[in-house]
A protein has these predicted regions:
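Short phosphate/oxyanion-binding micro-motifs
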Residues: 1-147, 163, 172-181, 504, ...
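Active site of divalent-metal-dependent phosphoester/diester hydrolases
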Residues: 64-79, 161-168, 179-206, 265-269, ...
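Arg/Lys-enriched, amphipathic patches
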Residues: 112-117, 126-127, 150-164, 234-400, ...
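Conserved catalytic palm subdomain of right-hand nucleotidyl-transferase polymerases, strongest
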Residues: 152-154, 487-496, 534, 545-554, ...
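Short, conserved micro-motifs composed of acidic
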Residues: 188-209, 214, 727, 742-776
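Surface-exposed loop/turn segments and immediately adjacent short secondary-structure elements
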Residues: 230, 234-236, 259, 274, ...
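Basic, alpha-helical interaction scaffolds
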Residues: 251-284, 771-838
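Conserved polymerase palm-domain catalytic core
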Residues: 580, 619-706, 715
Length: 984
């Protein structure tokens, strides 16, 4: 196979292989195919399900694999498409009753229809199963042949193609005749015991375009050979991926810092912008000598534990199996079995050695632990997007520079592409070089009658008489920011790694502080600090569509330092006028708080017999749509001094970006609207811009976090409720239109809740769009059902956790006790730590499911080991959530939480009594379902059961330390805990 592949390297190679359980053979497959990788690889009988993340089966040279799973015991297929081939999944062309994947492949501008399948034997009779298979396949082929000239079907059809007397052979041949298909595989493909058959097929309507169709013995599957064929098309290969990095092999930090200090003294500090440029160039020139830039080629990932002896054993096993299939003697069979067992033994030993080495010192270095286990437990951060091909104007583009320029044009004009309107700024209509005073005057006059500006003027408080100015910064503050840089963050456009900045912080702090203070004095943000490189990351959908990639900005670390200094001062001032309901990007605020407020508001209304409804709004490109001029006008209305406005205007204007694809970059383009979402200042500027939206909802029925906003309302009448939601939505849409933001009513979600068991599915008219309410919506990552029992959300959490536990059980014999503890804390418990108080009052069934997850996790530990904190008597998951609830109440009463949390946890009015002065007011309720089962009722019972000396602890840290033992038998106040449990 290797010789054949080498000779036809530029011809696409299609391969299909019934592997019979992928989870145990994936590393062997990677090793065998590393030298002869197919371009399209389909594996059948994978025997994996949703509990196995894609990251576990990721191959470096391929896109993220596509799967059609059955169960972890049978069936299933997985499809790999090599990077550089345009692939689009065709869900409408897929069979409903069998595992299959339909794809449209574009190779050299020619489209091919590929259907990969595995026909499993069902409980029904084989004849009925075959009939159903062809009955489903025929209409699909009818559609495919009318759209595509080139059809390829690959799969294990479980019908012996060569045996004319076999069941289903006649039906297969009739089907092939109808659609003009031929099977290009002529040899037997399956060798089960003493029976040989040809059940793996490659069918096509253009056999002349395929050549060297054959079977290949890999020695991995129990009884199947791999079938493959070459496409008679010349396909250019992607170039090897190369990366540029700084070599720290001979880096002398002391000599570098010594020379850096000398060089920086020679910089002129008359102009902050010029001084910043000189500092960066001086730093990079010196860094190029001490840590030169180097380039290296990235090879395909080999399994961590693969070594020479195991690799040789795998190759020898393949050869011995091939020899046995050619000549089935007892000696050849024995030799093959011995080699197969040796491979298993060597693999287990290699994995154990690798794990022992990686887990040898988890306390000081846990990175190897995450490197090994992460791909088996989650897809997060595991799949990259380095090789991209785009479809643009009916052309397929694979040149990195062309693609980078297309992305950059799209991202810099994303508002125009989304809404059809190009953002305008007053400076565009003024003579070039106009002073900021003239620009500000024009902006102020343009927006003086704007609804938002009027609303801001009407809501200004007395505390805002002193205009805000940016103040100079101290060397100590800059030094601390330099030392706090994350050394793992990406390197910005200036090529200076954060690690080197941390090393040289003592030398760099003084000159950098001086430059920053000059810029603050001159009201200028350095031009070089406004440059960004953009990395496109694939989201979902068609990979050849540029709209399916989100931009991730990479800024220089020095730019982040300057941004952090401005941000700290902006936060202090903006807190004086920001709505208390603005939750995102604020200290002490979280998604849990806004969701608790929403859910508790719903439950209170439902407890009183109201209908409750909510609209989840869809804001398209919210950060990108912000008008620079309108933002400046709003900040002016909020009493920002002219000098501060000039500095912010300088920060926003003239920002430029390029897009990077591998080692290629696009041209720079100027950003004309929006605030950079990945920047330090972007989030706080977004909050300032959107703050006045809350002024238009005097009933405080707007709930938001970042660009996710929901409107809630209630009524005793369903029709009246629908009218209220429609009117409220119009208010929000009008605000968005007036503020040049894009609302998409057709994508709004709606939910209606009531106290009865019936679901209410109705239409709500919003600006001419009929929005159908649903019984389940997703908000900020939480699935919320119309009965607020969170069964769906907790079910998903338990399913995810169950899959991760399955993985840990498979690795159990390789994991040390400390590694198991780390794995459970990092992955199992973390699943239930996101907004746990939101869904705490769930059904008993759901709570029991969570407890069972913990019990199953604890069974990973053998009785022979010291379990430490993981002893069977470990606190239940419910006790953990109650501890979290007590901490939230403590934070609320001590003003460490958003002020609106006082609406839920109200201090007791009886402050004169020494015994009751630390209590919170008990809440009345009418019904158990929505009244008693709520945080506002449960919280006071929990808090008031705690001893006063605990509730009055002076610091949050001391309170947390106490709560770690609350509920345990060794707790000082265990009797109080028992009384509380009996009370609820």
């Amino acid at each position: 196979m290797h010789v054949l592949r080498t000779k036809n390297l530029n011809n696409p190679f299609f391969a299909y292989y019934n592997i019979n359980s992928l989870r145990y053979k994936f590393d062997d497959l990677k090793e065998i195919l590393s030298k002869t990788p197919p371009d399209i690889l389909v594996l059948a009988e994978t025997k994996i399900d949703h509990t196995f993340p894609n990251a576990q089966f990721y191959l470096e040279e391929y896109y993220e694999p596509t799967r059609s799973d059955n169960s972890c015991h049978s069936g299933g297929i997985i499809e790999y498409i090599r990077k550089g081939i345009i692939r689009k999944r065709l869900n409408d062309f897929e069979l409903k009753s069998f595992e299959n994947i339909a794809s449209e492949l574009t190779i050299n501008k020619v489209k091919y229809f590929l259907l990969s399948f595995y026909r499993t034997e069902r409980k029904e009779s084989k004849i009925a199963n075959i009939k159903r298979f062809f009955d489903e396949l025929s209409p699909i082929l009818n559609k495919a042949t009318s759209k595509y000239d080139n059809i390829i079907l690959m799969g294990d059809i479980n019908i012996d193609f060569k045996d004319t007397n076999s069941i289903g052979n006649r039906e297969l041949k009739d089907f092939m005749n109808v659609f003009g298909l031929q099977n290009v595989i002529k040899d037997n493909t399956c060798f089960f015991r003493d029976n040989e058959s040809s059940i793996d097929v490659i069918l096509t309507n253009t056999p002349r375009k395929l050549f060297h169709s054959n079977t290949f013995e890999l020695g991995i599957s129990d009884c199947h050979k791999m079938v493959g064929t070459y496409l008679r098309v010349h396909m250019s290969r992607l170039k090897s991926k190369k990366i540029t990095y700084r070599s720290l092999k001979n880096f002398d930090s002391e000599a570098f810092c010594l020379e850096l200090g000398t060089k920086l003294k020679q910089i002129s500090y008359e102009n902050g912008n010029v001084a910043f440029d000189n500092l960066v160039s001086t730093y990079t020139d010196l860094l190029d000598r001490f840590a030169p830039l180097k380039c290296k080629t990235i090879r395909g990932n080999q399994s961590r534990f693969m070594n020479k002896s195991l690799s040789k054993a795998i190759m020898k096993r393949s050869a011995l199996k091939s020899k046995y299939l050619k000549k089935k003697t007892s000696e050849n069979r024995t030799n093959f079995k011995k080699q197969r067992n040796l491979c298993t033994k060597l693999r287990d030993q290699a994995i154990k050695n690798d794990f022992d080495e990686a887990f040898s010192d988890l306390n000081s270095n846990s990175k190897p632990f995450y490197d090994i286990l992460k791909p088996y437990l989650t897809n997060k951060g595991a799949l990259c997007n380095t090789d991209i091909s785009l479809s643009e104007n009916n052309n397929i583009l694979s040149n990195d520079i062309e693609i980078a320029n297309i992305f950059n044009e799209y991202y810099t004009n994303i508002v125009e592409h989304t809404s059809g309107n190009r953002p305008k700024n007053k400076a565009d209509d003024l003579p070039t070089g106009s002073s900021f005073d003239i620009i500000l005057d024009n902006i102020t006059k343009t927006y003086e009658d704007h609804p938002s500006i009027k609303a801001i003027h009407n809501r200004k408080s007395d505390s805002q008489h002193t205009p805000f100015k940016f103040k100079p910064v101290k060397i100590k503050n800059v030094f601390n920011l330099l030392k706090s840089l994350d050394a793992k963050k990406a390197v910005g456009i200036d090529g200076i790694p954060p690690l080197i900045l941390k090393i040289s912080a003592k030398i760099l702090a003084e000159p950098l502080t001086r430059i920053i203070n000059i810029c603050i004095s001159d009201n200028v943000f350095p031009t070089l600090a406004k440059l960004a490189s953009i990395l496109p990351f694939f989201k979902k959908g068609d990979r050849s569509n540029k709209k399916n990639y989100r931009p991730v900005s990479v800024l220089s670390s020095l730019s982040k330092i300057f941004g952090k200094i401005l941000q700290n001062q902006l936060i202090d001032f903006s807190n004086s006028f920001l709505s208390k309901y603005i939750t995102s990007y604020r200290k002490g605020h979280s998604t849990q708080h806004v969701l608790i407020r929403l859910i508790e508001d719903w439950k209170a209304k439902l407890d009183n017999g109201f209908y409750v409804g909510a609209i989840m709004m869809d804001l398209s490109k919210a950060f990108d749509c912000i008008s620079h001029d309108l933002l400046i006008a709003k900040m002016n209305a909020y009493k920002f001094d002219k000098s501060a406005l000039k500095l912010i205007y300088s920060y926003l204007k003239g920002r430029r970006q390029c897009v990077k694809i591998n080692s290629s970059s696009s041209n720079y383009q100027t950003i004309i609207s929006g605030v950079p979402q990945g920047s330090i200042l972007g989030p706080i500027l977004f909050n300032i811009f959107i703050n006045d939206l809350y002024f238009f909802f005097p009933n405080d029925n707007l709930f938001g976090f970042a660009d996710d906003h929901s409107i809630s309302n209630s009524s005793t009448s369903l029709e009246e409720l629908k009218g209220k939601l429609s009117d409220d939505s119009k208010v929000a849409i009008d605000w968005l239109d007036n503020n040049q933001m894009i609302a998409n009513p057709s994508k709004f979600q709606a939910i209606i809740l009531n106290k009865s068991k019936d679901h209410i599915l109705t239409d709500i008219n919003i600006e001419g769009h009929n929005i159908k309410s649903s019984d389940l919506v997703t908000l900020l990552g939480i699935d919320i059902d119309d009965k607020i029992n969170f069964d769906s959300h907790i079910g998903k959490l338990c399913t995810k956790t169950g899959g991760q536990l399955n993985c840990l059980y498979r690795f159990n014999k390789y994991l040390s006790v400390s590694a198991k503890k780390l794995a459970i804390n990092s992955y199992i418990y973390s699943n239930f730590s996101y907004c746990p108080l939101v869904w705490h009052c769930s059904s008993t069934k759901s709570k029991n499911s969570i407890e069972n997850m913990q019990k199953r996790a604890l069974k990973l530990f053998d009785d022979s080991h010291s379990l430490g904190d993981f002893k069977p008597g470990k606190s239940s998951m419910e006790v953990k959530r109650l501890r979290s609830l007590a901490i939230e109440i403590y934070k609320t009463l001590n003003h460490l939480n958003p002020n609106y949390m006082f609406e839920i946890f109200k201090p007791s009015e009886n402050r004169s009594s020494e015994r009751l002065k630390h209590n919170i007011a008990s809440q009345r309720f009418k019904q158990v379902k929505f009244g008693k089962n709520s945080i506002r009722v449960l919280g006071p019972k929990l808090w008031n059961s705690l001893p006063n000396q605990v509730k009055s602890l002076p610091t949050l840290e001391s309170f947390k330390n106490f709560m770690k033992t609350w509920g345990n038998k060794d707790c000082k106040y265990y009797d109080k805990y028992i009384s509380y449990v009996q009370a609820i």
